[in-house]
Amino acid sequence: MASLGAILLFAIASLMHGRPIHSDRKGAKIPLAGSNLGYKKSSNMYGSRLFQGMRYPPSMIQLYQTLILGNDTDLSILEYPVLQESDAVLSFLQKVSCVVVGNRWTLSFDMSSISSTNELKLAELRIRLPSFERPQDVTVEIYHTKKGQENLFMGSFKTNPSVAMGSSWKVFNLTRMLQYYLHQGEQFTNDEYIEVKNLHEGAKPQVIKRRARTEVEEGLQGNKDNTPTSSFPTERVVLVVFTRDKPTANHFGSPSLIHTVESSKYVMSESTVRVADARRHRRNQKTKNTIIMNTIPSRSAGNPLCRRVDMIVDFEKIKWGDRIVYPKRFNAYRCEGACPIPLNETFKPTNHAYIKSLVKLYDQEKVECSSCVPVKMSPLSMLL
């Protein structure tokens, strides 16, 4: 009987432990670990397991708290204006632990998600420094690494690991280093590297010529001098990048059919046509100017020409707000208006759309009007 009573007591205690608290209260909150904010409980089948087991970079949580609470004082002088202009904030953890060889630190990140079509507003390297017996100058080397590819050395800078009292984090401005990598990466050779001194003070990087690249790759290739090595965990280092989408001059990256036709030797110029047959040229001048010069015809039936307009997607309205923490909405854009006939390069048409518009120019009933389709898509960074 005593053993049976113990079993029943244990079962009751287990049920009491597993019983939801205040489950009937509307708008129950699930607190996020490491913060005093709460999020609405999910209405899906996963329930409270939505955020279970998830780990968030502390810097991103702090930034999210700043956005929600509107506490601009927590932002640095650089972050405040940049945050207002940025479309996305990306965070990168180290691919491997920081390798410390003597006074040289080697940091590796996979920055493949940073596109050259994005305008880089700010890049901050945040390091939670370990305890040192005595401060000493160190050289921090930054690498771009991706599985199956050779590590790309991006640059280095010198600093002192000492931090201000009451803070264990030190922030470095790597904006110029990443801008060089994004915009001049094709000219980057094995003999060069970028040395950034006092970068957090706004100094410009200097390209230094090196004949031997092994000197800057010691941290990743091995310790040849038997210098004492150490490391600290990946979560102590995070790279935070603020970006903004920018329009590109050519979405396709290669000459379109219109450019190919214009540069063809079989296409006669307007002056050649006029010399060959002046009468026929005058009779068909309007049509030829439309095709050869790619002029935009006037608006038909008072409809505005096709253009990109805003289309705000609100996750709260589509019932996804309880799962998506940030952003709560974004601009997906859409096309509005009538396409001209024929299309010209201003609207960046595909070859199929251009041919289709030419067919419609001569036979209105044979094909339907061209329609806009996305020509460029980019991932949206979200905190779930």
Curated annotation (Swiss-Prot):
Propeptide positions in the record are: 19-283
Q: What PROSITE patterns does the entry give?
A: TGF_BETA_1, TGF_BETA_2
Gene Ontology MF annotations: cytokine activity; growth factor activity; morphogen activity
Q: What induces it?
A: By dorsal-mesoderm inducing signals including activin, vegt and other nodal-related proteins. Beta-catenin potentiates the response to activin and vegt. Not induced by wnt8 alone, but wnt8 potentiates the response to activin.
Arranged from A to Z, the UniProt key words for this protein are: Cleavage on pair of basic residues, Developmental protein, Disulfide bond, Glycoprotein, Growth factor, Secreted, Signal
Q: Where is coiled-coil annotated?
A: none
Q: Which domain of life is it from?
A: Eukaryota
Q: What does this chain do?
A: Cooperation and regulatory loops of multiple nodals are essential for mesendoderm patterning in early embryos. Essential for mesoderm formation and axial patterning during embryonic development. Activates the activin-like signaling pathway to induce dorsal and ventral mesoderm in animal cap ectoderm. In addition, also dorsalizes ventral marginal zone (VMZ) tissues during gastrulation. Induces muscle actin. Appears to act as both a short-range and long-range morphogen. The unprocessed protein inhibits bmp- and wnt-signaling.
Q: Which family does it belong to?
A: Belongs to the TGF-beta family.
Q: What subunit structure does UniProt give?
A: Homodimer; disulfide-linked. Forms heterodimers with the TGF-beta family member derriere. Interacts with tsku; enhances nodal2 activity.
Full protein name:
Nodal homolog 2-B
Q: What organism is listed for this UniProt entry?
A: Xenopus laevis
